[in-house]
């Protein structure tokens, strides 16, 4: 099922939670809505679900306007962060609930309901636990039950609101891989909300980065990480360094010195330079580069992270180096140059 939102605006009182949001979602896509708290991602999800009504704008399921439809009429599967399972019901009863409460003219026969539920319980790898109650399950198992329940109604769209937020880190990693496999097998159009960028980049076909009620960028994980279109996206996705620089005759200057980088097609003036901690090379000598005093050094898995104080403006950056290279750079000052970087002029 294709989903399209056009010029959505949502106000709570006088506060605009969403501002002119337009988004096209292809049938069968797995979309991540990613952003910090207050960015509007959960509000957008709730509008698509029908749990909130837009102040302005329209929502389409396929070619039909779904803006005025109820939640039931939209046939949404919704998975909440805290499971929302019925504690007095078994796993099987939880999964079959959505089908059993349908009107008689839309309710499958009892045997079909049971068959569908058992198939889904098997799909989410909980066979043998049909008679257990939620209190007898782990957090990861409860979330699997919640997903099976959402899929039991054969939803037009599957929506997940921070589905792994209440789980510990290792379980989250396991469930991320599992959810991607489930999506590939079922093909439901799926949107999930997260503030975890690693989760979004690993799981999604496309990522929608949101900030202050608006969409900053939509793209594949590679596009979002490698080609951010705004300072916010560059700073929010992954680790990054940010320096206020000056452009003069196509050359980039920092603290009154050229740093060996050129941006020939950019106008002279103030700009902001972004680069990733691992996208640097060490330079012998002190000209045409960034130079700083090492203020901290720590081992992080297979790399060593160095913090550098760059001087007058109290600017500091972090670089990541292989341990063997970092050990040779383990001195009071080092010089470096970004190998991949992006400039935002007038920022």
From Swiss-Prot:
Mode of membrane association: Peripheral membrane protein
Domain of life: Bacteria
Entry GO terms, CC: ATP-binding cassette (ABC) transporter complex
EC number: 7.3.2.3
Catalytic activity from the UniProt record: sulfate(out) + ATP + H2O = sulfate(in) + ADP + phosphate + H(+); thiosulfate(out) + ATP + H2O = thiosulfate(in) + ADP + phosphate + H(+)
SUPFAM superfamilies in alphabetical order: MOP-like, P-loop containing nucleoside triphosphate hydrolases
Keywords: ATP-binding, Cell inner membrane, Cell membrane, Membrane, Nucleotide-binding, Plasmid, Sulfate transport, Translocase, Transport
Compartments where found: Cell inner membrane
Annotated ranges, domain ABC transporter: 3-237
Record bears the keyword Nucleus: no
InterPro entries (alphabetical): AAA+_ATPase, ABC_SmlMolc_Importer, ABC_transporter-like_ATP-bd, ABC_transporter-like_CS, Mo/tungstate-bd_C_term_dom, P-loop_NTPase, Sulph_transpt1, TOBE-like
GO molecular function: ABC-type sulfate transporter activity; ABC-type thiosulfate transporter activity; ATP binding; ATP hydrolysis activity
Residues that, per the record, bind ATP: 35-42
Coiled-coil annotated residue ranges, if any: none
NCBIfam families named in the record: 3a0106s01
Similarity annotation: Belongs to the ABC transporter superfamily. Sulfate/tungstate importer (TC 3.A.1.6) family.
Function recorded in the entry: Part of the ABC transporter complex CysAWTP involved in sulfate/thiosulfate import. Responsible for energy coupling to the transport system.
Oligomeric and partner information: The complex is composed of two ATP-binding proteins (CysA), two transmembrane proteins (CysT and CysW) and a solute-binding protein (CysP).
Entry protein name: Sulfate/thiosulfate import ATP-binding protein CysA 1
Name of the coding gene: cysA1
